Amino acid sequence: MTLVQDRPTVTTNIATIKQWVTAMAKGDLDHAPYAEDAELSDPNGKYKGKAQILQSFKVWKTAFPKATAEVTNQIAQGDHVATEVVYKAIHTGPLVASSGTIPPTNKPIELKVMLVSAFRDGLIVRERAYFDRAGLMQQLGITIPPKP
């Protein structure tokens, strides 16, 4: 394929991610663009299948129900899209974490996230999300003791 032929797919994939990031921040998970066999990995773990991925987003939406998201940059090539996002929210619900449930702190957060998404037939099949988990805990006022 030539670059010109790839452009509509690249443009569509970029738009899909941008729309999804906005919808997810609002809690609209109904049209999540993940394939049934998709995989997501982030600092909290690995999720296999659309159902597990959506459950991980529900945990975040419970803790941060009124989040906003701004896509600040996107770069795409072929079936891959890299997206920088800034999420802003207030922690008003319980946050289920690997160490236990963190009760609401009512503190604002700003979380910078890098998404690297791979598409197949217009759906996300693999995604890696990178963010500063320790920085998030610090914003919530949670101190994580160093490992011995």
Language model region names:
Residues 1-148:
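C-terminal and inter-domain tail/linker signature
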